């Protein structure tokens, strides 16, 4: 399955919520009607979605938020299911611990997609070692730093400036001058997307 490269706003409209696929400087505006599905006239039917349809839609929404393809998403779910605790919450925490997401959360990338691209271009080190794998699982205490040769990249500088203004999650700490951050701990569920109902995903894979 190929990665989606079409209009980002269309995906958010399809899910009826902002998936934060666009940077803050190009955020969705009133022209993007999230309550209207993609297409010339949007939703034309008031038909009730089945339970399975709702479960499938929730999975698609989370996949699109994190830029994950189906096979990889199934692996994350299997890993979450093996671990102790709430499977749905564990799934979200595994996704939040991806290096491309942590880069985004620390403000070094304006979107997760940009974070993924920067990671693949070897713009960061983890504990002093260059890592170019977007799915790398960051652990508490890990230090993510922008490499010296990448510190002048305009998109990193601009993204960090915007992040400083809007604020960063409590589970990361960032030294903007050094352009490095520490992943302090896995986020609490309350610090992850509130419009995600992970229990629907668990129900889907438990069918």
UniProtKB/Swiss-Prot annotation:
Location of the region described as Disordered in the Swiss-Prot/TrEMBL record: 31-56
HAMAP family xrefs: Ribosomal_uS4_B
Keyword rRNA-binding carried by entry: yes
Domain S4 RNA-binding: from-to ranges: 97-157
Skewed-composition ranges (Polar residues): 42-53
Protein name per the record: Small ribosomal subunit protein uS4
Keyword tags: Ribonucleoprotein, Ribosomal protein, RNA-binding, rRNA-binding
Gene Ontology molecular function: rRNA binding; structural constituent of ribosome
Keyword NAD: no
GO cellular component: small ribosomal subunit
Signal sequence segment: none
Protein function: One of the primary rRNA binding proteins, it binds directly to 16S rRNA where it nucleates assembly of the body of the 30S subunit.
One Pfam family named in its UniProt record: Ribosomal_S4
Family designation: Belongs to the universal ribosomal protein uS4 family.
Subunit structure: Part of the 30S ribosomal subunit. Contacts protein S5. The interaction surface between S4 and S5 is involved in control of translational fidelity.
GO biological process, one term: ribosomal small subunit biogenesis
CDD domains: S4 (cd00165)
